[in-house]
């Protein structure tokens, strides 16, 4: 009897310590998805991440989220305009600026599509996690970005990712 009274609490503590909540697993999966997409995953430095939040379609963002994205993109665009003389002098741009411009144009296309489509809030479709990170690209140049990872309703599968550069 004495042995069981010690083993049962010990076993329950081990089980509790080994269990992670589904939301913690989604954050971990989002980080793994990010690592798998990078040229140099060992150089990844995650600077922030959100807890999983409800998603209502992979193209629906709240007004606050869109405003945040547009503010970030505005800062990046102003940096690019300054470095390239209003995009009139791209030939002298350094590799970092060229890479930033490429990533900004890709993100701008996605954001414009979201805004102009004005996707209404649909039914609950799953979860989303945002990760801010720093890493190096295929040329070894350091960069910063914000990555959105969308999961299915069960939080087990990544269904879409979306990324914008950070200044």
Residue ranges and their predicted role:
Residues 19-167:
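Cystatin/cathelin-like cysteine-protease inhibitor module
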Residues 1-17:
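Sec-dependent bacterial lipoprotein signal peptides
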